[in-house]
Regions:
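C-terminal regions of RecA-like/P-loop NTPase motor modules
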Residues: 2, 6-20, 31-115
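H-loop/switch region of ABC-family ATPase nucleotide-binding domains
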Residues: 27
Length: 115
């Protein structure tokens, strides 16, 4: 449950501060966040991980945008602006991602989602 995540989140933040390093933590989203729209989930959709959203300096969520693209949302940025969306293309043959524009992502969606 969420109470078990709070001390973990706090410890991750303490380690990051004391070692002056960045830590990447992955969290599952709840069912409400896994909706049918194309937009990525929001911070409130972090499943049992409210503390991660509160303790984090940056929260980026992602969602599949068709078969070959991903859409990301900068949901929280403690040191700057947030709310930006950005897109990437996925290359399944080597597992790499490449940043692309929304127009390019839309074209990929049209091309590969018909297969």
């Amino acid at each position: 449950d969420w109470r078990s995540m709070a001390p973990i989140s706090k410890h991750l933040k303490e380690v990051a501060i004391s070692t002056n390093t960045r830590i990447l933590a992955a969290a599952q989203i709840n069912r409400e966040g896994d909706n049918a729209t194309w937009r990525p989930p929001q911070t409130k959709h972090l499943s049992q991980s409210d503390a991660l959203g509160q303790d984090a300096d940056v929260v980026i969520t992602q969602k599949q945008y068709g078969q070959r693209a991903m859409v990301y949302s900068l949901e929280k940025n403690r040191h700057g602006s947030s709310g930006q969306l950005f897109f990437s293309r996925f290359f399944p043959n080597n597992g790499q991602f490449e940043e692309i524009t929304k127009d390019e992502a839309d074209l990929l969606r049209e091309r590969y989602d018909d297969e």
